Amino acid sequence: MIFSNNKKLKFKRVIIKLSGEALQGVHKFGIDIIELNRIAKEIKAIFDLGVQIGIVIGGGNIFRGKKLAKFGINKVISDYVGMLSTIMNGLLLCDSMDLVHLSSCLMSSICIDKICEQYSFKKALSLLRRNKVVVFSGGLGNPFFTTDSAACLRAIEMRADIVLKGTKVNGVYSSDPKKSSNSILYKNISYNEVLQKELKVMDLAAFALARDHKLPICIFNINKPNALYYIVTGQKEGTLIR
């Protein structure tokens, strides 16, 4: 699809929450390079419109801390292993973006100076202003916090207009669409309605952070072609929470 670069932007600075599972493609584990490259092109399309982009990346395609904890491994240790998985994903995403001539910087909450930069609020903000894509890895650098919390905190710190959470479904539903044919897809919903209806959007700590700072969240299907383009240009896509 050929995009128009003259489209008026609804959101000029965004934080994309990209789950590890989004990078799996058709696989049950690891990374689907074809899917990774497709996502990089989707990111490039909105970058070319003039959108400033930060990406918080997950690591569930490689490792989930919760799984080891179930087998008796210390939760702190298993969470740190999960954080390392996000750095691996971040490295590959940056390389994929480089292939489409998209300049990026991988930052991490965990210090691994050979392969990524230590997260710095001022440096990250400066990079965004200079039109570099910033990939935030390592979660928050502390156990017991999810990458959803990292996405919301980084969005607040970077003064982003919105968090775009890419999932495998088209948005927020009234019930599980796989279990109920009567499930309704919400196009717009408030923070309070999400809490009252006990809808699964993200973990409560992350969601409360977004609500308290009046940070809009859009839940959308990352596997749907052109979804990012539609969102930043103000077209109806996914579920907008505000």
Swiss-Prot record:
Q: Which GO terms describe its molecular function?
A: ATP binding; UMP kinase activity
Q: Which reaction does it catalyse?
A: UMP + ATP = UDP + ADP
Q: Which residues bind UMP?
A: 59, 79, 140-147
Keywords of the record, alphabetical order, are: ATP-binding, Cytoplasm, Kinase, Nucleotide-binding, Pyrimidine biosynthesis, Transferase
Family per UniProt? Answer: Belongs to the UMP kinase family.
UniProt xrefs under HAMAP family: PyrH_B
> Which protein is depicted?
Uridylate kinase
